[in-house]
Regions:
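Alpha-helical scaffold segments that mediate packing/assembly in large oligomeric complexes
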Residues: 2-77
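A broad, low-specificity signal for short, low-complexity segments enriched in glycine/proline
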Residues: 38-45, 82, 95-100, 138-143
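Residue-level recognition of well-ordered secondary-structure positions
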Residues: 24-28, 82, 180
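Sequence/fold signature of self-assembling virion shell proteins
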Residues: 103-206
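Generic secondary-structure boundary/loop-capping signal
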Residues: 1, 5-8, 35, 43-44, ...
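Amphipathic, alpha-helical segments enriched in basic
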Residues: 1, 5, 95, 154-158
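Short loop/turn segments at secondary-structure transitions that flank enzyme active sites
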Residues: 8, 32, 87-89, 126, ...
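Extended, solvent-exposed, turn-rich assembly/linker loops in the middle of proteins
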Residues: 50-113
């Protein structure tokens, strides 16, 4: 629930619209939470919905080129890896130790590390255990390729952004206006080989 005192919007609305700025910050926080849920939610999160046949463990602990090759070999058209930034750093160290050099590629205008031409995208929502281990995801995406897809309602009342709406709740006797900001999201793995997980990736203690 976003609460904004009317005095704030009356007195401090220049040079920036205070309601719009507060709403922007609220939406950003919701999107961060949404990303966390898509990875970690026990019902629909990707970490909990990988088929056991497509869950691998590292050969020696740290994420090696051979480990990522194993992940790639389990599915066609892998679109990207998803890894914690510290796991990406650990993979870079292993590449150096094995005297191999990963590629780079451009995703949304930013240059990122890649392996066999597949981007390795950073995601700090992937958990790190107390023992200093994490997981790396590999996935094929899109309905046409029977991959991992995101789900959201097609239309929402008072829609502000796709899958997100803002509903006016009223004004209190203290002149505080309330808005209910809600995000609706889920994910689905259309066929088991669309998602693979490399577990027990050692990156050192957090």
């Amino acid at each position: 629930v976003l609460r904004v005192h009317n005095r704030v919007t009356d007195l401090y609305n220049q040079p920036m619209n205070q309601l719009e700025q507060q709403l922007r910050l609220t939406v950003e926080a919701l999107r961060e939470r949404q990303e966390h849920e898509l990875i970690n939610n026990t019902e629909f999160g990707l970490l909990h919905n990988a088929d056991l046949k497509h869950r691998l463990t590292t050969r020696t602990g740290p994420p090696s080129p051979l480990d990522l090759d194993d992940l790639l070999s389990r599915r066609r058209k892998t679109r990207f890896f998803l890894a914690h930034p510290r796991a990406i750093a650990a993979f870079g160290r292993e590449c150096t130790a094995h005297r191999v050099y990963p590629d780079t590629t451009v995703v949304d205008g930013k240059r990122v590390l890649a392996w066999r031409g597949v981007p390795i995208l950073p995601c700090d929502k992937l958990p790190i255990s107390p023992a200093g281990t994490t997981s790396i995801l590999a996935m094929r995406t899109g309905e046409d390729d029977s991959g991992v897809i995101g789900l959201r309602p097609k239309d929402l009342p008072d829609e502000y952004q796709p899958g997100l709406n803002v509903r006016f709740m009223g004004v209190s006797d203290r002149a505080v206006t309330s808005y209910l900001v809600s995000a609706y999201h889920s994910a689905a793995v259309l066929v088991p080989d669309a998602l693979g997980v490399l577990d027990d990736v050692e990156i050192g203690r957090p």
